């Protein structure tokens, strides 16, 4: 499931910030 903030992306099992 994708539980990231609007400006974050989901990769495998964690979120990362997209710049």
Swiss-Prot record:
Expressed by the venom gland. GO terms for cellular component: extracellular region. It comes from the Eukaryota. The keyword Disulfide bond applies. Disulfide bonds join 4-15. Keywords: Disulfide bond, Lectin, Secreted. Transmembrane segments: none annotated. GO terms for molecular function: carbohydrate binding. Belongs to the true venom lectin family. This is C-type lectin domain-containing protein 1. It comes from Daboia russelii.
